[in-house]
């Protein structure tokens, strides 16, 4: 029993030494790029810049808002899909970029289910088909 306790105590001691080093990594430690798939001055651009300012204030890091308009938003979303999935490149997406483009384009350059993970919901819009 005493031998078993020594091994258990040793394992716990090693784990306690490892955990603080894993937790020491900080995020973010460099600027965050926020891609907007619409033109400058659009509602999405204004919202993303407002969110970017708040995110910068909370994290203490700069948030660079980059407009990548064109091709119904596929240019920005394809760039996001190619980016390293480390949280330093995020995008302002809509139902157009996440749903409609997948149905409209044969090869949009991204798969919204596999390539992206939601962070937050900014707002909602009701659509009506007439």
Question: Model segments located where?
Answer:
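Well-ordered beta-strand positions enriched in small/hydrophobic/aromatic, beta-favoring residues
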Residues: 90-91, 119, 129
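Residues that line or immediately flank small-molecule/substrate-binding pockets and catalytic motifs
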Residues: 12, 95, 123
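N-terminal signal peptide c-region/cleavage motif recognized by signal peptidases
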Residues: 19-21
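Bacterial N-terminal signal peptides that target proteins for export
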Residues: 1-12
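N-terminal (or domain-start) structured segment
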Residues: 24-115
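Short Pro/Gly-enriched coil loops immediately N-terminal to beta-strands
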Residues: 114, 119-126
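Hydrophobic/proline-rich hinge and linker segments of small-molecule sensing/allosteric domains
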Residues: 106, 123-130
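Repetitive helical segments and hydrophobic/amphipathic motifs
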Residues: 15-16
């Amino acid at each position: 029993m005493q031998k078993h306790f020594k091994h258990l105590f040793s394992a716990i001691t090693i784990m306690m030494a490892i955990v603080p080093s894993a937790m020491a990594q900080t995020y973010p430690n460099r600027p965050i790029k926020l891609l907007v798939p619409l033109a400058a001055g659009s509602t999405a651009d204004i919202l993303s810049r407002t969110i970017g300012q708040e995110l910068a204030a909370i994290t203490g890091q700069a948030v660079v808002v980059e407009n990548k308009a064109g091709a119904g938003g596929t240019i920005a979303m394809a760039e996001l899909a190619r980016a390293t999935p480390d949280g330093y490149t995020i995008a302002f997406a809509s139902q157009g970029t996440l749903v409609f483009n997948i149905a409209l384009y044969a090869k949009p350059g991204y798969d919204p289910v596999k390539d992206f993970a939601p962070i937050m919901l900014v707002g909602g819009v009701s659509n009506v088909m007439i």
